[in-house]
Every structure is written in structure tokens, then in C-alpha cells.
């Protein structure tokens, strides 16, 4: 069991790490020593402050960023092990969404050409996809629906009841664990999902509270937080993360990670923006893969015990550097296709894991606090 530090950092942390947070070391060797010491402190239970995390964002240059990744990877190994949590998703209802999320091609405010429009898929079709995901190695299968939330749908009860029935059918006919991402939930809906057998629910914060109004105006960041609290109160694990590369600052990224830590979410999907033509963010330059690696590493240092998941955009942004993310703090992957874009074949992902000495499976949640 990891010991939790009871007294301030100044009473524990070594001189090398103190130096890291007073000014960044000038040589590669000094930086490596300082980051190694920081990793040891985090493994022992130290929690990074906002100011310390922002200092880490000043690390620049490919070689130094890779040193940061190595430190994060040591934390990942010590706190999470070498099993990579594999999941898959299905878009059970697509297009025509009332919300104006700037990154999403399913919005009625800016529909993308690559976004199909269809109603809720049948239980049989969803079940077939669940079986295919299980055969590909996924341990969880998430039913994702467009829209602000099922509580806003009309007729309100029919679709939600169908989803509950589909969840029960998946549990009866497969060994894969069904998850859901249906938008905002009332406490009663969260409880109904828990009773049907849903143990994890995806509802991303997407960005920091400060940056959120820049990308969405039809609902608030606090609306999202409320749903996360509702599902956790029902005993459902929170799969809650965000998107990197929407024009946010490094401080915004740190604030998102800290908010996730405060909410004690269990799983953190990190999407790397793969901008879609026709959306307000369609013209943004692609995120630099080394900035993505730096973000992944800092998220791991802030969230040492959480499942941190490669989600949408990893192929488009990381390209041939995808494997480096798995050595920078990532310990989970979404395999197969995404909501409106294609992913790489699961066999390629499995081969990548094997080449890194990692094993696909299901990562247990930390039982001694997040």
C-alpha cells in the first residue's frame, strides 16, 4: 500500500526536486535527476500543486519532454502496473444534437459532412457490436448517444428504457462490461443505470471551467460536474476527461486535471483534437505530438492512480509516435472506431502493446484513494 505523506512537501522532498520548482535545471542530467526524485515523491503520495504543475509545462524540447515522460511512466508502473485497459464504443444515436460544442460535427449548429444522422439503434445491432468488440479484446463497451441527455429526449422514457434493456442483454450474452455515455443524468436515471448493471459512465468535462465558455454556450461546465456527482453518488465509476488542442492554455490543461482529481474520477479519457471540417474548430492547426506527450505526462503526475486513456485523435495527432504515449503515462486505450471517425485495426493496437511489453486487459481501480 502506498503511504500518504502527512506533512508538507518541504519536510520530505529532496533538494533536487526543490530545485526543479525554484527554476528548471539547466542540464539534461540535472533535469533527469530532479524528475526522478519527483516521481519517487509522487509514488510515495505527494500531490502536485497547481503552481508546481505549471512549472512542469515549461519543460520544452523533444529530449527534455521525453525525460518528463520517463518520470510519468515510472509513476504509471508503480501505481497502475503494466495492464492496459481496453474499451470500445458504439455511436447508438447520431447527429442532430441540440448543443453547440465547437469540436463536434454532430451538432445541428454546425453539422459536419462526416457525421451520419440516425435514431437509436436496435438492441440486436448494439449486441452484435458488443460481441465484436469483445472478440477484438475490449473489456468494456460504451453505448454513446448524441444530445444533452436522455432526460431531454422525447418521448423521455422509451429510449432510456430501451438502453436499460440493451445493457441487461449485453450482460446476459457476453462477458464484456457495458458502459454508457448518454449526456446529463438525473440522480434517478443514474440509479436506474446502476441497477441495470452499468458500472462506469462517460461524461467528459472537456476543458477547464475557465475555458469551457469558449467552446460551448448551450450548457455550462457546472452542468457536467453535476452529472459526474450524480453518477458517483449512484455508485457508478466516472469516466471523465477532456480534449487537448482546442486552443486552451497550459494553465487550462492543468486546471482540468486538477478538477478531475478533486472529483476523484476513476477513468480519464484524453482526446487529442482531430478537428472536423465545418465545425468552429475546423481550422485549428493539429496539436504537436510532443505537446500531447507533455500533457499526458503531466496528467499522470497529477493523477497517479487513475486510468488515463488514449481516446479520440491519437492516430491523427500522434501518428508513428503513438507508442510513446504508452510510455508517458497512458494505461488505457479506446480500440476500434470512434463516433464519427475511423480508428486503426485492433490487431495493430494489440501488436503495439506486445512490442512495449504491455498487456491488454482491464485495469483495476485503486482501492486506497485517488
UniProtKB/Swiss-Prot annotation:
Signal peptide: none
Gene3D superfamilies, per database record: Aldolase class I (3.20.20.70)
Enzyme Commission code(s) on record: 2.8.1.6
Family (UniProt): Belongs to the radical SAM superfamily. Biotin synthase family.
InterPro entries, sorted: Aldolase_TIM, BATS_dom, Biotin_synth/BioAB, Biotin_synthase, Elp3/MiaA/NifB-like_rSAM, rSAM
Record-level GO BP terms: biotin biosynthetic process
Keyword tRNA-binding: no
HAMAP family to which the protein is assigned, alphabetical: BioB (MF_01694)
UniProt-listed PROSITE patterns: RADICAL_SAM
Superkingdom as given in the UniProt entry: Bacteria
Keyword annotations: 2Fe-2S, 4Fe-4S, Biotin biosynthesis, Iron, Iron-sulfur, Metal-binding, S-adenosyl-L-methionine, Transferase
Cofactor: [4Fe-4S] cluster; [2Fe-2S] cluster
UniProt: [2Fe-2S] cluster binding residues: 142, 179, 239, 309
Known function: Catalyzes the conversion of dethiobiotin (DTB) to biotin by the insertion of a sulfur atom into dethiobiotin via a radical-based mechanism.
Assembly notes: Homodimer.
Designated name of the protein: Biotin synthase
Binding residue positions for [4Fe-4S] cluster: 97, 101, 104
Enzyme's top EC category: transferase
Domain Radical SAM core positions: 79-314
Keyword Protein biosynthesis appears in the UniProt entry: no
Cofactor info, note text: Binds 1 [4Fe-4S] cluster. The cluster is coordinated with 3 cysteines and an exchangeable S-adenosyl-L-methionine. Binds 1 [2Fe-2S] cluster. The cluster is coordinated with 3 cysteines and 1 arginine.
Coiled-coil positions: none
Pathway: Cofactor biosynthesis; biotin biosynthesis; biotin from 7,8-diaminononanoate: step 2/2
GO molecular function, one term: 2 iron, 2 sulfur cluster binding
UniProt-listed Pfam families: BATS, Radical_SAM
Catalyzed reaction equations: (4R,5S)-dethiobiotin + (sulfur carrier)-SH + 2 reduced [2Fe-2S]-[ferredoxin] + 2 S-adenosyl-L-methionine = (sulfur carrier)-H + biotin + 2 5'-deoxyadenosine + 2 L-methionine + 2 oxidized [2Fe-2S]-[ferredoxin]
Amino acid at each position: 500500500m502506498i503511504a500518504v505523506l502527512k506533512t508538507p512537501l518541504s519536510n520530505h522532498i529532496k533538494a533536487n526536486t526543490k530545485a526543479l520548482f525554484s527554476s528548471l535545471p539547466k542540464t539534461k542530467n540535472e533535469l533527469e535527476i530532479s524528475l526522478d526524485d519527483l516521481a519517487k515523491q509522487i509514488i510515495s503520495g505527494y500531490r502536485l500543486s497547481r503552481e508546481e504543475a505549471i512549472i512542469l509545462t515549461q519543460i520544452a524540447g523533444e529530449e527534455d519532454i521525453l525525460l518528463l515522460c520517463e518520470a510519468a511512466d515510472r509513476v504509471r508502473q508503480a501505481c497502475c502496473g503494466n495492464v492496459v485497459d481496453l474499451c470500445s464504443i458504439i455511436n447508438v444515436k447520431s447527429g442532430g444534437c441540440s448543443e453547440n460544442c465547437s469540436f463536434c460535427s454532430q451538432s445541428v449548429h454546425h453539422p459536419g459532412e462526416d457525421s451520419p444522422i440516425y435514431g437509436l439503434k436496435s438492441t440486436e445491432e448494439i449486441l452484435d457490436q458488443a460481441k465484436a468488440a469483445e472478440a477484438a479484446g475490449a473489456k468494456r463497451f460504451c453505448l454513446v448517444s448524441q444530445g444533452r441527455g436522455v432526460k431531454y429526449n422525447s418521448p423521455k422514457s422509451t429510449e432510456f428504457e430501451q438502453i436499460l434493456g440493451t445493457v441487461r442483454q449485453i450482460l446476459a450474452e457476453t462477458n464484456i462490461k457495458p458502459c454508457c455515455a448518454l449526456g446529463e443524468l438525473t440522480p434517478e436515471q443514474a440509479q436506474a443505470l446502476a441497477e441495470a448493471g452499468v458500472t462506469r459512465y462517460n461524461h467528459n468535462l472537456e476543458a477547464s471551467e475557465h475555458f469551457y465558455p469558449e467552446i460551448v454556450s448551450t450548457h455550462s461546465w457546472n452542468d457536467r460536474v453535476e452529472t459526474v456527482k450524480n453518477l458517483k453518488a449512484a455508485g457508478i465509476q466516472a469516466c471523465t476527461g477532456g480534449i487537448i488542442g482546442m486552443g486552451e492554455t497550459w494553465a487550462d490543461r492543468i486546471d482540468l486535471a486538477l478538477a478531475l482529481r478533486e472529483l476523484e474520477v476513476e477513468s480519464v479519457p484524453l482526446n487529442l483534437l482531430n478537428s472536423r471540417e465545418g465545425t468552429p474548430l475546423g481550422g485549428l492547426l493539429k496539436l504537436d505530438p510532443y505537446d500531447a506527450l507533455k500533457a499526458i505526462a503531466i496528467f499522470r503526475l497529477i493523477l497517479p492512480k487513475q486510468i488515463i486513456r488514449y481516446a479520440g485523435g491519437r492516430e491523427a495527432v500522434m501518428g508513428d509516435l503513438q507508442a510513446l504515449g504508452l510510455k508517458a503515462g497512458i494505461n488505457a486505450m479506446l480500440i476500434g472506431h470512434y463516433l464519427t471517425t475511423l480508428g486503426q485495426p485492433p490487431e495493430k493496437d494489440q501488436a503495439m502493446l506486445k512490442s512495449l511489453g504491455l498487456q491488454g486487459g482491464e485495469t483495476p481501480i485503486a482501492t486506497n484513494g485517488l
